[in-house]
């Protein structure tokens, strides 16, 4: 979970109230966080967050905003955000080339002016950059942030591609290095260049006079990408592969800098083709949607009897604009710096936090029951122990994923997969119908680890089912992957035989027609003449889609069918 260090004096100054340590500890719990350490000598507080859904809190400005809002009940306002029907004036432009749009497509930025950067402010900004890029940005793969002195930049900025031979002087060096040399020799290149595995073009940020700003998301240039004590005018950019995550990250930084005293000046990004929010986006940009909440649903889940007005007041303590037109429903507008409301239940949780947990009385259960493991869970544990005994490492994945990973890379039509009707992000728009894509994705980022690789997961998958009343069916599946240059169909066939031997289940195989496998190297598994799964050598075409260079063998089987 994210941990941050903040200056206590700066936090209290932003809150506008001199809270005791006890008061601070109590109110920080409303941010799903706890104080780990108070360093009186260095004026620092170490805080650990128990939730990764609130990156807006991972800074002194963001946490102070939360506490100040909770104490006052006043929703903060930011007048520099553009909306679909209310575009702000922009003070610079970023042009995205068609070539980079296929590699790392999204970039947004803004200018910040009016404050002098001292050592503490630089430390705060660098920590914010690291936490957003590493934690929320998945080690810069999903999102990464860059900071520059805007006095050195000639707008407009061009976001383009370059070859591995392109040279500039990177931050922390005194000599020119090619992109290839940065990837192989620079500490940041060694750490983050796997983001660009199996590509021959790399992202590059240039100003109007072709001065290099950075090689995002790897390293800034030494000349323009160095922030120093005394700088007053900043340019902030965020690049990423997820549109909404990139926009949200930029919004968080803009709000933090505004709360620190900067004036925020919007910048327009021009894309080569349409995005979800248009071809031209002026940022910071408010993209979140309103939610309609049923009052009865809130009271039923909380065991309360609150009115719509009560709930709206409680939500405002969390910075959430809420209003009601009728007594049985109300509407909320997420704050500009939040995008974690996926369901009505998320809003109900905020009502509970706003009301205060102390205001809910504890109740003993009315019924007494004895719990026990379900048959499928007992069987799953047996299978899990067998897999671990055969040298496999267990993985745990999300059930939601992207169309790219679940359909396009797997080379399937996807007609049986379930899609989310209103996904908050493209990364979670489909419910998985197979575990194999997750295993292949893990293998694609594991090439630096010694072979052989042997991983597995026992988890749920869901598919359309026109026969059932719900229209869907959920299975518990076992899937495993073996990766090594020596692995072939013979090895996985032997392992499957061992697995079924120890489970004491008879089975048959027949040649599989799935395009997941190399022709003649895949087999369907039949138990009592019913196909429950398959195994084989993965097709080179699918391996190349995931950027995997080593032969892989996979199995996936429905363990509900094995149990029954």
From Swiss-Prot:
Record GO terms (molecular function): ATP binding; magnesium ion binding; phenylalanine-tRNA ligase activity; RNA binding
Reaction catalysis annotation: tRNA(Phe) + L-phenylalanine + ATP = L-phenylalanyl-tRNA(Phe) + AMP + diphosphate + H(+)
Report the enzyme's class at the first EC level: ligase
For biological process, the GO terms are: phenylalanyl-tRNA aminoacylation
Domain B5: from-to ranges: 286-362
Q: Which UniProt keywords apply?
A: Aminoacyl-tRNA synthetase, ATP-binding, Cytoplasm, Ligase, Magnesium, Metal-binding, Nucleotide-binding, Protein biosynthesis
Gene Ontology CC, one term: phenylalanine-tRNA ligase complex
**Listed EC numbers:** 6.1.1.20
Locations listed in the record: Cytoplasm
Q: Which cofactor does it need?
A: Mg(2+)
Q: Can you tell which superkingdom this protein's organism belongs to? A: Bacteria
What are the binding positions for Mg(2+) in this chain? 340, 346, 349-350
Q: How does it assemble?
A: Tetramer of two alpha and two beta subunits.
Concerning its family, UniProt says:
Belongs to the phenylalanyl-tRNA synthetase beta subunit family. Type 2 subfamily.
Q: What is this protein called?
A: Phenylalanine--tRNA ligase beta subunit
């Amino acid at each position: 979970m994210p941990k941050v260090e903040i200056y206590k004096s700066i936090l209290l100054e932003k809150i506008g109230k001199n809270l005791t340590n006890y008061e601070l500890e109590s109110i920080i719990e409303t941010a799903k966080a706890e104080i780990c350490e108070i360093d009186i000598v260095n004026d620092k507080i170490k805080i650990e967050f128990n939730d990764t859904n609130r990156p807006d809190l991972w800074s002194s400005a963001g946490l102070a905003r939360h506490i100040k809002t909770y104490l006052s009940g006043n929703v903060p306002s930011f007048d520099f955000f553009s909306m679909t029907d209310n575009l702000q004036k922009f003070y610079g432009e970023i042009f995205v080339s068609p070539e980079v749009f296929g590699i790392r497509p999204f970039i947004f930025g803004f200018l910040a002016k009016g404050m002098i950067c001292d050592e503490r402010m630089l430390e705060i900004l660098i920590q914010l950059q690291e936490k957003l890029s590493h934690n929320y940005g998945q080690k810069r793969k999903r999102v990464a942030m860059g900071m520059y002195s805007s006095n050195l930049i000639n707008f407009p900025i061009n976001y383009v591609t370059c070859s591995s031979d392109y040279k500039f002087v990177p931050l922390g060096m005194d000599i020119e290095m090619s992109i290839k040399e940065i990837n192989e020799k620079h500490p940041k290149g060694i750490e983050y260049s796997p983001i660009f595995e199996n590509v021959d073009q790399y992202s590059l940020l240039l100003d109007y006079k072709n001065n290099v700003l950075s090689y995002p998301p790897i390293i800034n240039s030494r000349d323009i990408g160095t922030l120093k004590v005394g700088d007053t005018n900043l340019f902030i950019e965020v690049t990423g592969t997820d549109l909404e995550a990139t926009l949200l990250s930029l919004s968080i930084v803009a709000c933090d800098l505004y709360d620190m005293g900067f004036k925020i000046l919007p910048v327009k990004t021009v894309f080569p083709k349409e995005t979800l929010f248009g071809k031209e986006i002026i940022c910071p940009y408010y993209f979140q949607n309103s939610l309609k909440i049923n009052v009865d649903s809130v009271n039923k889940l909380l065991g309360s009897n609150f009115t719509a007005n009560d709930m709206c007041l409680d939500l405002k303590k969390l910075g959430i604009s809420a209003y009601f037109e009728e007594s049985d429903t109300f509407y909320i507008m997420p704050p500009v710096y939040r995008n974690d409301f996926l369901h009505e239940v998320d809003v109900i949780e905020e009502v509970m936090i706003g009301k205060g947990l102390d205001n809910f009385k504890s109740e003993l259960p009315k019924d007494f029951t004895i719990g026990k493991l379900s048959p499928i869970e007992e069987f799953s544990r047996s299978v899990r122990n067998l897999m671990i005994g055969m040298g496999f490492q267990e993985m745990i994945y999300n059930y939601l994923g992207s169309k790219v990973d679940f359909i396009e890379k797997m080379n399937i039509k996807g007609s049986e997969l379930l899609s989310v009707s209103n996904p908050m992000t493209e990364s979670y728009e489909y419910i998985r119908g197979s575990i194999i894509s997750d295993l292949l994705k893990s293998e694609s980022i594991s090439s630096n680890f010694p072979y052989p690789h042997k991983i597995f997961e026992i988890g749920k998958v869901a598919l359309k089912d026109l026969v059932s009343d719900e229209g869907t069916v959920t299975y518990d599946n076992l899937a495993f992957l073996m990766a090594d240059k020596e692995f072939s169909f013979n090895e996985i066939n032997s392992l499957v035989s061992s697995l079924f031997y120890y489970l004491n289940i008879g089975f048959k195989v027949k040649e599989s027609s799935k395009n997941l496998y190399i022709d003649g190297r895949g087999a369907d598994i039949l138990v009592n003449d019913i196909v429950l799964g398959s195994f084989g050598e993965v097709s080179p075409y699918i391996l190349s889609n995931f950027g995997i260079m080593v032969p892989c063998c996979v199995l996936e089987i429905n363990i509900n069918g094995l149990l029954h």
